[in-house]
Amino acid sequence: MQKLLIEGGHDLTGQVRISGAKNSAVALLPAAILADSAVTIEGLPEISDVDTLGDLLEEIGGSVSRDGQDITIHPEKMMAMPLPNGKVKKLRASYYFMGAMLGKFNKAVIGLPGGCFLGPRPIDQHIKGFEALGAEVTNEQGAIYLRANELRGARIYLDVVSVGATINIMLAAVKAKGRTTIENAAKEPEIIDVATLLTNMGAKIKGVGTDVIRIDGVPSLHGCRHTIIPDRIEAGTYAIAAAAKGKEVIIDNVIPQHLESLIAKLREMDVTIEESDEQLYIARNRPLKSVDIKTLVYPGFPTDLQQPFTSLLTQATHSGVITDTIYSARLKHIDELRRMNAVIKVEGGSVIVSGPVQLEGARVKASDLRAGASLIIAGLLADGITEITGLDHIDRGYERLTEKLSSLGANIWREEMTDIEIMQDQNM
């Protein structure tokens, strides 16, 4: 096991290139199951979630070859292999195997998925959609069993706007007989990315990016090449880091329209931001003003940037209030930030951050992916050295994070943990 060490106080300057979108990758790879021939996805991030999904595709009989950031999947010999245990439980997005395998084979067995614990994140809307399409869904010994004689198009209203349910129902519906309409659908860029792949494979999908998606089922889908979109959450994380500790930072390979809510909030804080087609220029030359944020479904402020933004607010004048309406339990980073001298209160469903304060280096633990990003930004700001454990969470979603921050001027490195440190970490 490794730990991450950061010597705070070094300004960030230079250019960083954003990787392919994690939240697209975890759906694009299972979507390849639906094709009858090879699918190549270009620009995938080199992160552990992608490795896990590649292994799962091989478990069900697929052939997966990797060439740098490009992966080619041969689905011709895939079978409806049950996946009740093992790697399927390592990440939450393995639930996309439900929709893809149901769409391809009319049956699937998938262990209840894992990933970051963020409080109650039920998959009831996914199941509602599968049942509407004609599947029988049961929960047996910690695995979801899906069976259907045939899938037929249906009108499905999502009770809550859900990215996962929207994508999963799309995957199951593209080969169903007739038309499927998803109402109150999510609008995230990653959904558009998945729909673009499916359309390139021969699917008939309209309305993606709006709250009503219409899918006319087709009998078969073919292989194709697809280039993934840039990761707006990674781009947002570096934008927040640049606002916190940057002089002049250029973020390359980004779609600024995907980050309008964050850019607006950073400008409210007096951060200088200039946009071009694929780049953001960020400079901090004035004291930060505090702001309030409320996470919302896209195009609102992303829940995945709430935790990194908390660290930024510790440097702003006066108090800022953060309310996460998507995952209210996303608060495990707060105790760790308090260890670093942050002044944070939790009242009801809101987090109140007071500043500016000088953060202090400390030993802290990342409890989930975006909590890890929050602690890294705090480490860049802190006086002294910050030690961060729980890197398995961080490596799930940030490609070459140590190298990218080092190239911007951060003093950041990894070290192997001793046996004693591992024992202490397990008791934290």
Curated annotation (Swiss-Prot):
<dbReference type="InterPro" id="IPR013792">
    <property type="entry name" value="RNA3'P_cycl/enolpyr_Trfase_a/b"/>
</dbReference>
<protein>
    <recommendedName>
        <fullName>UDP-N-acetylglucosamine 1-carboxyvinyltransferase 2</fullName>
        <ecNumber>2.5.1.7</ecNumber>
    </recommendedName>
</protein>
<keyword id="KW-0132">Cell division</keyword>
<feature type="active site" description="Proton donor">
    <location>
        <position position="116"/>
    </location>
</feature>
<feature type="binding site">
    <location>
        <position position="92"/>
    </location>
    <ligand>
        <name>UDP-N-acetyl-alpha-D-glucosamine</name>
    </ligand>
</feature>
<feature type="binding site">
    <location>
        <begin position="22"/>
        <end position="23"/>
    </location>
    <ligand>
        <name>phosphoenolpyruvate</name>
    </ligand>
</feature>
<dbReference type="InterPro" id="IPR036968">
    <property type="entry name" value="Enolpyruvate_Tfrase_sf"/>
</dbReference>
<dbReference type="Pfam" id="PF00275">
    <property type="entry name" value="EPSP_synthase"/>
</dbReference>
<keyword id="KW-0573">Peptidoglycan synthesis</keyword>
<dbReference type="GO" id="GO:0005737">
    <property type="term" value="C:cytoplasm"/>
</dbReference>
<comment type="similarity">
    <text>Belongs to the EPSP synthase family. MurA subfamily.</text>
</comment>
<feature type="modified residue" description="2-(S-cysteinyl)pyruvic acid O-phosphothioketal">
    <location>
        <position position="116"/>
    </location>
</feature>
<keyword id="KW-0961">Cell wall biogenesis/degradation</keyword>
<keyword id="KW-0670">Pyruvate</keyword>
<comment type="function">
    <text>Cell wall formation. Adds enolpyruvyl to UDP-N-acetylglucosamine.</text>
</comment>
<keyword id="KW-0133">Cell shape</keyword>
<dbReference type="GO" id="GO:0009252">
    <property type="term" value="P:peptidoglycan biosynthetic process"/>
</dbReference>
<dbReference type="InterPro" id="IPR005750">
    <property type="entry name" value="UDP_GlcNAc_COvinyl_MurA"/>
</dbReference>
<dbReference type="GO" id="GO:0071555">
    <property type="term" value="P:cell wall organization"/>
</dbReference>
<dbReference type="GO" id="GO:0019277">
    <property type="term" value="P:UDP-N-acetylgalactosamine biosynthetic process"/>
</dbReference>
<comment type="pathway">
    <text>Cell wall biogenesis; peptidoglycan biosynthesis.</text>
</comment>
<keyword id="KW-0808">Transferase</keyword>
<keyword id="KW-0131">Cell cycle</keyword>
<dbReference type="GO" id="GO:0051301">
    <property type="term" value="P:cell division"/>
</dbReference>
<dbReference type="InterPro" id="IPR050068">
    <property type="entry name" value="MurA_subfamily"/>
</dbReference>
<feature type="binding site">
    <location>
        <position position="304"/>
    </location>
    <ligand>
        <name>UDP-N-acetyl-alpha-D-glucosamine</name>
    </ligand>
</feature>
<keyword id="KW-0963">Cytoplasm</keyword>
<feature type="binding site">
    <location>
        <begin position="121"/>
        <end position="125"/>
    </location>
    <ligand>
        <name>UDP-N-acetyl-alpha-D-glucosamine</name>
    </ligand>
</feature>
<feature type="binding site">
    <location>
        <position position="326"/>
    </location>
    <ligand>
        <name>UDP-N-acetyl-alpha-D-glucosamine</name>
    </ligand>
</feature>
<dbReference type="GO" id="GO:0008760">
    <property type="term" value="F:UDP-N-acetylglucosamine 1-carboxyvinyltransferase activity"/>
</dbReference>
<dbReference type="GO" id="GO:0008360">
    <property type="term" value="P:regulation of cell shape"/>
</dbReference>
<dbReference type="InterPro" id="IPR001986">
    <property type="entry name" value="Enolpyruvate_Tfrase_dom"/>
</dbReference>
